[in-house]
Amino acid sequence: MSGGTFFSRVAGHLHLRKAGITMSQRIVVALGGNALGNNLTEQYHAVRETAKVIVDLIADGNQVVIAHGNGPQVGMIQKAMAELTRINPEKYVPCPLPVCVAMSQGYIGYDLQRALDEALRDRGIAKPVSTVLTQVEVDPEDPAFQHPTKPIGSFMTQQEAEALAAQGCAVMEDAGRGYRKVVASPQPKAIVELAAVRALTEAGQVVVACGGGGIPVCRAENRRLQGAEAVIDKDFAAELLAESLDADLLIILTAVEKVAIRFRQPGETWLSELTPEEAEVYIAAGEFGAGSMLPKVEAAVRFARSAPGRAALITELQKARAGIAGETGTRIREA
């Protein structure tokens, strides 16, 4: 049905649809850590551009929850903390990776929260913004702990990567852009602070949660939580967050406008619509790079299948609003 106005109930929410466009959706937006810049100054400016786009979505009547990556940031934090330990090992003990993730959640959330608050005020929208320090439970037996694949930190030359590998660190090439350190990236199982995130969302706040994929934690035998040496992929964490909040749309923002097959190769083709089944064919064919587009497509497929009427959109930041309107981006949903 097109050209008219009608109501539908999707994922527990009542929406007004007009000309095929769903209005007033609950949306989880996943921001890439690479889009936040390589240092504090770059991040300060980057989050302000990001906030403008997100506030556009809020101004359209959507309820928005934000998750974000931290790949470059958590690597820089870990490197800085390791340097302090090297300089003075008696004073500065090694900093565990989950603590580094928590640090990244704090300072990225701080910048996002300020930028969103300013952008909302500029538009005359009265909405509180909250950042929730979020733990995400993983399985200690997840095979990912034996096969690190998650890139963190800045890009390196091949020579720098070989030197780091000689120190016992795992490194890999990242989508033809250089080499990066990689760490374990287990699948998220449960969001520990979900009740808090849901309460704030239902109260009408703009919530930043699951930063950097969430602080990875495992349940010990006594059922207490303990940190895990890993970084959870933010796309999978955002997908779990979207499912858990009964969201209608998962938007995964990346550096390209659409998903492509044969990316940067002869015959490169950009895709506008995919069913989960079509996406899985391309996944099986190795069309998407591990650590870059692959987890985005896998997360999108998972969300599209999680309940009737749900969809995922993969596009770049400045195209998010147009993507919601169906004008661009790659939308993954059941036929």
Where are these regions (language model features)?
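N-terminal amphipathic/hydrophobic targeting modules at extreme N-termini
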Residues: M1-G3, V10-H13
